[in-house]
């Protein structure tokens, strides 16, 4: 959906989706007998176990659906990723609770009784990995060796996908324009400042508080000064108790928030559609690079092949076709490995 002491390290993880090359001929390298074997898709740990990429795609298409959770379209370009996956492989993508937190993703795995709605995969902050113990399926994507050891579980139960830098974003109608976090304690911002979620449940909000602590002379390890700052903003009426996201911004519920830079980019595009303008800056009093969000497969995924194909897709994009480039019937004409190669740009 963390290791707090590492938040200030500048991990070199791409801010959208890790872009690693996927070998287009992957399926053809598998033994001819592999595809003929009966496969338990819930325990498949690699494309080789699946009998090759063509076999994995075929089974995923047979399942026909993929259940995502907490993946809003304006977050890390998920909208385009979902559209491309659905169109390329003709798999229906269901997105539940798009604005949910990492903690809520784990709760959904633990408590969802209706298997049709059970999440197949999760995108969670490292801060909740302990809560996910025993819930995730080991699976190593084809590009496993290219993922830094520091951002993956050795057994393949999770792997870092993308990370961002903490930004301060705001409606351009705000005056004066904020340039640092401590600027937010200004009477001009009454009723304007929001956090991007609950810091006890959402990694983005947690690190926003850490950044605020740093800006006020504290540290990421001890966020007391960050908490005190937001208490002060609440007392003077600047802080509003709404989630700092695109939908609440559109209603005018707030005008200033902290959040990942890649989300600020997405919010900027969304705001333009409703006639508003957003700008973002990296606050001069807190330069904070986040550790990655990790992707993982639910051990009890109702669509286990589709879940594994999604992970292969997410770790394989380069500069190939996206949704607008794909013909509606491409998936009927092209086998799985070749389709993946087209998405990659091969």
What are these regions (language model features)?
Residues 1-63:
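Short, low-complexity disordered leader/linker segments with a strong preference
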Residues 50-61, 71-92:
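Short, polar/charged alpha-helical segment
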Residues 136-145, 156-160, 185, 269-289, ...:
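Short beta-strand->loop
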Residues 164-167, 210, 278, 291-295:
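Small-molecule pocket liners
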């Amino acid at each position: 959906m963390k290791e707090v002491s590492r938040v200030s390290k500048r991990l070199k993880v791409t801010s959208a989706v890790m872009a690693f090359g996927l070998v287009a001929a992957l399926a053809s390298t598998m033994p001819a007998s592999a595809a003929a074997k009966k496969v338990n898709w819930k325990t498949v740990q690699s494309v080789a176990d699946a009998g090759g990429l063509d076999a994995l795609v075929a089974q995923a298409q047979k399942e026909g659906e993929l259940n995502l959770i907490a993946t809003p379209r304006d977050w890390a370009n998920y909208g385009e990723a979902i559209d491309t996956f659905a169109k390329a492989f003709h798999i229906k993508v269901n997105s539940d609770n798009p604005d949910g937190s990492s903690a809520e993703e784990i709760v959904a795995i633990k408590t969802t009784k209706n298997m049709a709605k059970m999440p197949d995969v999760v995108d969670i902050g490292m801060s909740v990995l302990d809560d996910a113990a025993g819930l995730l399926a080991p699976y190593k994507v084809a590009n496993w060796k290219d993922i830094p050891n520091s951002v993956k579980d050795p057994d393949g139960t999770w792997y870092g996908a993308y990370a961002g830098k903490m930004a301060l974003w705001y409606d351009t109608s705000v005056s004066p324009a904020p340039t640092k976090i401590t600027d937010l304690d200004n009477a001009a911002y009454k009723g304007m400042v929001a956090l991007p979620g609950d810091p006890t449940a959402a990694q983005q909000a947690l690190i926003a508080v850490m950044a605020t602590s740093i800006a006020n002379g504290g540290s990421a390890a001890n966020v007391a000064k960050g908490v005190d700052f937001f208490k002060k903003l609440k007392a003077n009426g600047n802080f509003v108790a709404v989630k700092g996201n695109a939908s609440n911004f559109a209603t005018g519920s707030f005008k200033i928030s902290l959040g990942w830079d890649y989300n600020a980019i997405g919010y900027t595009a969304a705001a333009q559609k409703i006639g508003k303008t957003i700008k973002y800056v990296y606050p001069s009093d807190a330069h904070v690079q986040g550790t990655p969000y990790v992707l993982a497969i639910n051990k009890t995924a109702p669509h286990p092949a589709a879940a594994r194909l999604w992970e292969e897709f997410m770790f394989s994009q380069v500069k190939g076709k996206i949704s607008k480039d794909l013909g509606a019937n491409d998936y009927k004409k092209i086998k799985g490995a070749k389709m993946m190669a087209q998405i990659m740009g091969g």
